[in-house]
């Protein structure tokens, strides 16, 4: 990657984030007398991604997203003997050992799980906790979850903003339903938030589900 021009496409759901990042890069490039065009932003839907993936002038494709997307990108790039880097279907865990600093554990787990409303590819989805400290960690984390303020992300007093769209809300609800069906125990109740300020239907409560290994 180093030394090459970068052409990148953000998610079609967050084009303005892409524009903001590109503007930051442009400022850095200008301050360091770098030529324009080293980093090029293109926005659009999946068809733009398909165009980049099939273009033989692009020797390396790096893609972050679902495993379904990765299969398509990987096989398409391989057909033209290109190279691909795929980061797919994150299911990240934090392992908590008996000698862990529980204060740092709770802060790190909370931010890892609910930061950006759990929508980063590096979001924490699981905690694997040693039985000797399990109840203590569970109680501390549950207490922290119950103190979260959920609302407009432009209000700095809030900790958690909305999910990106209704599809994400449905995926969240289906995950809770599936967990219950498989024997999961709800520790901190989730659900869609209603009322003034939550009219979009995309604000949800972060949920903790207990599962025996």
Question: What residue ranges belong to the model's regions?
Answer:
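ALDH superfamily catalytic-core signature
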Residues: 27, 54, 60, 68-213
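A structured beta-alpha segment of the ubiquitous adenosine-cofactor-binding alpha/beta core
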Residues: 40-62
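Positions that flank functional sites
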Residues: 14-15, 44, 92, 194
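Conserved small-residue-rich beta-alpha loop and adjacent elements
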Residues: 1-32, 81, 103
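Short acidic capping loops at alpha-helix termini that bridge into adjacent secondary structure
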Residues: 35-39
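Short Asp/Glu-rich motifs
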Residues: 17-19, 48, 96, 198-199
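Short alpha-helical
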Residues: 13-16, 46-48, 67-68, 79
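Short beta->alpha connector loops at strand-helix junctions that form conserved
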Residues: 4, 9-11, 43, 64, ...
């Amino acid at each position: 990657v180093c030394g090459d021009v970068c052409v990148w496409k953000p998610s079609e759901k967050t084009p303005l984030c892409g524009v903001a990042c590109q503007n930051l890069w442009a400022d850095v490039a200008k301050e360091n007398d770098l030529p324009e065009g080293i980093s090029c932003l293109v926005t659009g839907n999946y068809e733009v991604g398909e165009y980049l993936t099939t273009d033989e002038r692009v020797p390396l494709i790096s893609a972050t997203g679902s495993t379904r997307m990765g299969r398509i990108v990987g096989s398409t790039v391989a057909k033209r003997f290109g190279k691909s880097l795929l980061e797919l279907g994150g299911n990240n865990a934090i392992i908590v050992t008996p000698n862990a600093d529980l204060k740092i554990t709770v802060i790190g787990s909370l931010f890892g799980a609910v930061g950006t409303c759990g929508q980063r590819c590096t979001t924490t989805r699981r905690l694997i906790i040693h039985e000797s400290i399990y109840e203590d960690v569970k109680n501390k984390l549950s207490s922290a979850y119950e103190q979260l303020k959920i609302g407009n992300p432009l209000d700095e007093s809030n900790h958690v903003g909305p999910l990106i769209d209704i599809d994400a809300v449905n995926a969240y609800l289906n995950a809770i339903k599936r967990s219950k069906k498989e024997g999961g125990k709800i520790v901190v109740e989730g659900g869609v938030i209603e009322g003034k300020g939550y009219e979009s239907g995309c604000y949800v409560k972060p949920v903790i589900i207990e599962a025996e290994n």
